[in-house]
UniProtKB/Swiss-Prot annotation:
One annotated Gene Ontology cellular component of this protein: cytoplasm
EC number: 4.2.1.19
Name of the protein in its database record: Imidazoleglycerol-phosphate dehydratase
Any one GO molecular-function label of the UniProt entry: imidazoleglycerol-phosphate dehydratase activity
Gene transcribed to yield this protein: hisB
UniProt pathway annotation: Amino-acid biosynthesis; L-histidine biosynthesis; L-histidine from 5-phospho-alpha-D-ribose 1-diphosphate: step 6/9
Class of the enzyme per the UniProt entry, highest EC level: lyase
UniProt-listed SUPFAM superfamilies: Ribosomal protein S5 domain 2-like (SSF54211)
InterPro entries: IGPD_sf (IPR038494), ImidazoleglycerolP_deHydtase (IPR000807), ImidazoleglycerP_deHydtase_CS (IPR020565), Ribosomal_Su5_D2-typ_SF (IPR020568)
UniProt-listed NCBIfam families: PRK00951.1-6 (NF002110), PRK00951.2-1 (NF002111), PRK00951.2-4 (NF002114)
Subcellular location: Cytoplasm
Organism: Streptomyces griseus subsp. griseus (strain JCM 4626 / CBS 651.72 / NBRC 13350 / KCC S-0626 / ISP 5235)
Length: 198
């Protein structure tokens, strides 16, 4: 079986983004967005999902980080969808709960072909982690879901440290996506849908 790879290049007046993802990789990551904490989160996604992930983004960081973060997430979602292909033989559903010290993230995904996000995290988080605006976390997932066309539920019932709260979400997402996108040996050649389409 050939590796499932997606590659997307997205260029606007605000950003230039290249994303390549191999769903059947070993967690090799090469990421550079110009936003240090975001790079750290994308590294978690690749390593814990065992996806080979390349991300190269040049954006209008002289304004702020919004366009860079958003457009990278859009391209990542599109590349993930491309890599999934016809979805024949995959598990389709995946979930994972990940602690990071005092914080906990619960993530469930359905590779359904229908974009939907439910996202909750503790209120009154620190507004910034380095140059990363913590209000962008939800927007990253919104952008990713819109292009990947998946249903994604993320719940962080508790946590104090903003870094930990965000990081455990990316780690749990990585594992949930890995489990959902892996091939089920009992369902070879079968599309996991009663309606015959995903």
């Amino acid at each position: 079986m050939s590796p499932r790879v997606g590659r997307v290049e997205r260029t606007t007046k605000e950003t230039s983004v290249l994303v390549e993802i191999n769903l059947d990789g070993t967690g090799k990551v090469d990421v550079a967005t110009g936003v240090g904490f975001y790079d750290h989160m994308l590294d978690q996604l690749g390593r814990h999902g065992l996806f080979d992930l390349t991300v190269k983004t040049e954006g209008d960081l002289h304004i702020d980080t919004h366009h860079t973060i958003e457009d990278t997430a859009l391209a990542l979602g599109a590349a993930f969808k491309q890599a999934l292909g016809d979805k024949v033989g995959i598990y389709r559903f995946g979930n994972c709960t990940v602690p990071l010290d005092e914080s906990l993230a619960q993530v469930t995904v359905d590779l359904s072909g229908r974009p939907y996000l439910v996202h909750t995290e503790p209120e009154n988080m620190a507004p910034m982690i380095g140059t990363y605006d913590t209000t962008m976390t939800r927007h990253i997932f919104e952008s990713f879901v819109a292009q990947a066309q998946i249903a994604l539920h993320i719940h962080v019932p508790y946590g104090r440290n903003a870094h930990h709260i965000v990081e455990c979400q990316f780690k749990a997402l990585a594992r949930a996506l890995r489990y959902a996108s892996e091939h089920d040996p009992r369902a070879a050649g079968i599309l996991p849908s009663t309606k015959g389409a995903l």
